[in-house]
Every structure is written in structure tokens, then in C-alpha cells.
């Protein structure tokens, strides 16, 4: 990848290893900055180099602890604006609060994704780069440009999962994920598609009801954007095995893996879970033999390079 001289890469505390790998792909280094905490827990951030007139790319996922990482992002953005950076691009591989993107019927709740978008714009971010945004329409909450990287296809192609399977079938874990699953199936050798029809009786609980499609003697690959408690995946895997699937693998971009997720995965019919490094794996997940993590550093670096060189980003994902 060509050297990009006029940009600077910085990061918060959410995912420094990903930021370092992105910088290496761009043949550059991480900018000098201090991020720490005051004695009362408030965030302290200071830029330790001249960034006047520079194009800043600030890499910061907003996963657990979500509120801490969101606040870091906001304060860092304000610091770069006050330091007269020419542009400030927020590179947020995992966009926290994305699942709170609408009011459900008459619920008296905030639209939290919109609140985060408003804060980012208020402090002066110029652009957002994110990965497999939970809902594409969240881009409409922003007045600034948003580049949503579609990582699923690239990640599965690089891992060559489908090449290892003789009769693969892409599976959507719910009706809402059909568009994503269909796009992946089309790009990956026009693989067949199955759908899990499920009902969710309570938050963070999923009950599989029906499998739409013949999965008998097939190697199934469930694709989703987020794996949180893993309830959806585990129920889906059981349903697929009951219908005669030979193996069940899964690809999920964002490994939130909260609560008993790792235990649920180990005790389930899932043979392998492939995730990316948009969120660092905690210790239990990193040791889990069923979980494989692949890096998106090259894809993110390519996106940054294209933006910097004023080249198309969308062409990376077109047939």
C-alpha cells in the first residue's frame, strides 16, 4: 500500500492493536497523544504533536465499556478541532448504540444512535468510517459523509471458509438479516440461502421457530453483524442440526460476546465462529477453541488510503 504522508493516525483506548496494524498497512506510525484518567475518573486527552492542517484519522470502536469509549471519542474529536486539524475522520469499526436506532411503536425511549451522531457532529468530525453498520439507515442520522465498510464478504473470502466446504449454504439468523445474507451468498459463488424464522420473547433472548430452506446434508454458514449473548446463533445452530445440517459455522463481524456468550458457544452445536478485530477479544473468548478472529486492518487501511487519494470506496464492494 502506498505511503500516505499527509495523514496522521491516532487512537483511543478501545482498540490500540487494530490502530497499530492499520498504521503499519499505511506505512506510517501512530501519532503522539496522551490518554489517561484523572483521579476522579474523568478522561484526560492531550495531543503531543503539531496537527495544524493535517488530515486526522481517529480509530476508536465504541464497544464495552461503551460509555467510556464514546466519551473518549467525543473529547478527542474536540481536541483535534481546537488544534486546527484540516479534517477529522472518526474511524469507528464497531459503532456502539447502533441497535438503538428507532422508537419501538409508542415506547418512551431515546433514539440513542441519533444522539451519538449529533454529539460527533457537534464536536467537529468531518467524516465517519464504520464497519458493517447494524442498520444502513443510521447513515441518515449524519450530515457528514459516512463510509460503511462491508466487511463480511471480504473477511469470508480471505478466510476461504467456503472453499473448505463441499456443499456450503449461507444462512440468515433472522428475517431482518436476509438482505445481508443474500448479498454474501451472491458474491460467494452464488451459494444457496436459508433463513431462520425466529421470535424473540424478551430482550437478549431468541427462540428459533422454523428453518426456511432445505439444509439436509449441507455445510451451513450463519452470517450476522453482531454476536452478543450468542443466543440467536446457538438456537439457530441447533435448529439447523435438527434439520440435518452436517456442520454449522458462523461469521459475525463484531464480537461483543457479553455475559455467558463464550460458554453458550462452547455448549452449542456451532462448530466454528469467525469474528473480526473490530472489538478486541476478552481473555475467555481468546482462549475459546471454537472462536477464530481475523483482522480487518488491511481493509480499513485501504479505505483510508482511498479517501485520502480521493478514490472511490464503494467500488471495493461492487461486483
Swiss-Prot record:
GO terms for molecular function: ATP binding; kinase activity; magnesium ion binding; ribose phosphate diphosphokinase activity. The active site is at residue 198. Pathway: Metabolic intermediate biosynthesis; 5-phospho-alpha-D-ribose 1-diphosphate biosynthesis; 5-phospho-alpha-D-ribose 1-diphosphate from D-ribose 5-phosphate (route I): step 1/1. Its EC number is 2.7.6.1. One of its GO terms (biological process) is purine nucleotide biosynthetic process. The keyword Metal-binding applies. GO terms for cellular component: cytoplasm; ribose phosphate diphosphokinase complex. It is an enzyme of class 2 (transferase). Keywords: ATP-binding, Cytoplasm, Kinase, Magnesium, Metal-binding, Nucleotide biosynthesis, Nucleotide-binding, Transferase. Coiled coil: none annotated. Mg(2+) 2 binds at residue 174. Its cofactor is Mg(2+). Binds 2 Mg(2+) ions per subunit. Mg(2+) 1 binds at residue 134. ATP binds at residues 40-42, 99-100. D-ribose 5-phosphate binds at residues 200, 224, 228-232. It is found in: Cytoplasm. It catalyses: D-ribose 5-phosphate + ATP = 5-phospho-alpha-D-ribose 1-diphosphate + AMP + H(+). InterPro entries: PRib_PP_synth_CS (IPR000842), Pribosyltran_N (IPR029099), PRibTrfase_dom (IPR000836), PRTase-like (IPR029057), Rib-P_diPkinase (IPR005946), Rib-P_diPkinase_bac (IPR037515). Belongs to the ribose-phosphate pyrophosphokinase family. Class I subfamily. Involved in the biosynthesis of the central metabolite phospho-alpha-D-ribosyl-1-pyrophosphate (PRPP) via the transfer of pyrophosphoryl group from ATP to 1-hydroxyl of ribose-5-phosphate (Rib-5-P). Homohexamer. This is Ribose-phosphate pyrophosphokinase. The gene is prs.
Amino acid at each position: 500500500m502506498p505511503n500516505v504522508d499527509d495523514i496522521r493516525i491516532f487512537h483511543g483506548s478501545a482498540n490500540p492493536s487494530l490502530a497499530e496494524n492499520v498504521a503499519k498497512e499505511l506505512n506510517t506510525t501512530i501519532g503522539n497523544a496522551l490518554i489517561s484518567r484523572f483521579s476522579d475518573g474523568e478522561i484526560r486527552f492531550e495531543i503531543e504533536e503539531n496537527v495544524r492542517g493535517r488530515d486526522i484519522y481517529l480509530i476508536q470502536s465504541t464497544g464495552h465499556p461503551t460509555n467510556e469509549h464514546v466519551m473518549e471519542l467525543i473529547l478527542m474529536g474536540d481536541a483535534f478541532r481546537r488544534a486546527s486539524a484540516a479534517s477529522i475522520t472518526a474511524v469507528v469499526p464497531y459503532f456502539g448504540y447502533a441497535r438503538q436506532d428507532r422508537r419501538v411503536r409508542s415506547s418512551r425511549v431515546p433514539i440513542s444512535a441519533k444522539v451519538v451522531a449529533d454529539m460527533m457532529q457537534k464536536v467537529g468530525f468531518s467524516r465517519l468510517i464504520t464497519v458493517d453498520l447494524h442498520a444502513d439507515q443510521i447513515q441518515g442520522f449524519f450530515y457528514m459523509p459516512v463510509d460503511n465498510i462491508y466487511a463480511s464478504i471480504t473477511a469470508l473470502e480471505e478466510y476461504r471458509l467456503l472453499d473448505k466446504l463441499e456443499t456450503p449454504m449461507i444462512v440468515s439468523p433472522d428475517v431482518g438479516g436476509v438482505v445481508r445474507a443474500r448479498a454474501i451468498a451472491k458474491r460467494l459463488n452464488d451459494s444457496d440461502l436459508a433463513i431462520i424464522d425466529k421470535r424473540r420473547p424478551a430482550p437478549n433472548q431468541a427462540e428459533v421457530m422454523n428453518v426456511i430452506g432445505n439444509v439436509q446434508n449441507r455445510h451451513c454458514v450463519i452470517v450476522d453483524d453482531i454476536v452478543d449473548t450468542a443466543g440467536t446463533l446457538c438456537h439457530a445452530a441447533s435448529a439447523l442440526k435438527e434439520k440435518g445440517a452436517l456442520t454449522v459455522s458462523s461469521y459475525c463481524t463484531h464480537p461483543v460476546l457479553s455475559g455467558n456468550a463464550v460458554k453458550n458457544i462452547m455448549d452449542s452445536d456451532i462448530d466454528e465462529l469467525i469474528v473480526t478485530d473490530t472489538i478486541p477479544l476478552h481473555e475467555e473468548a481468546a482462549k475459546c477453541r471454537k472462536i477464530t478472529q481475523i483482522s480487518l486492518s488491511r481493509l480499513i487501511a485501504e479505505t483510508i488510503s482511498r479517501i485520502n487519494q480521493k478514490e472511490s470506496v464503494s467500488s471495493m464492494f461492487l461486483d
